[in-house]
Amino acid sequence: MDLKSLIRDVPDFPKPGILFRDLTTLLQNQAGLRYVIDQLVEKHANAGIDYVAGIESRGFIFGAPLAYRLGAGFIPLRKPGKLCAPVYAVEYELEYGRDRLEMHQDAIEPGRRVLIVDDLIATGGTAAAAAGLIQKAQAELYGFAFIVELTDLAGRQKLPDVPITTLVTY
């Protein structure tokens, strides 16, 4: 399936000079959404994944059905202040400032195998922070799964040496 044909390009969003890859059009397409989840399941079905950790917010959209299909639990990796119990937190650099990801401290037992999922990898900062959360929990980072990779931004170079799955590259 040609996933690129299901992804809308939005020029100058969120600011001039940026070409935004809008996956909402992919999500609206029943066959496209099914194909994405089926592809991710096929690539990770035999990996012994205990948990899928989805990065807020579009990682939730793809991560939860993937976890269900893999027979794994789902862990939301949230922006600051969204979780109600004690958290692990990792700060990371943005183009203009800093941000933080958080995860409940009791979300993952040490040694459990985790796949991190997000819709897109660009510079890799958010995904690297997500990996830091898994490390703080003393769990095993199995790998990453992204629908889209923006290769010019070299985000995968910031990530640990684990399997990285992408379905579409630009």
From Swiss-Prot:
Pathway this chain belongs to: Purine metabolism; AMP biosynthesis via salvage pathway; AMP from adenine: step 1/1
Catalyzed reaction equations: AMP + diphosphate = 5-phospho-alpha-D-ribose 1-diphosphate + adenine
Any one GO molecular-function label of the UniProt entry: adenine phosphoribosyltransferase activity
Signal sequence segment: none
Membership in a protein family: Belongs to the purine/pyrimidine phosphoribosyltransferase family.
Assembly mode: Homodimer.
Entry function: Catalyzes a salvage reaction resulting in the formation of AMP, that is energically less costly than de novo synthesis.
PANTHER family: ADENINE PHOSPHORIBOSYLTRANSFERASE
Name recorded for this polypeptide: Adenine phosphoribosyltransferase
Organism: Thermosynechococcus vestitus (strain NIES-2133 / IAM M-273 / BP-1)
Protein's gene: apt
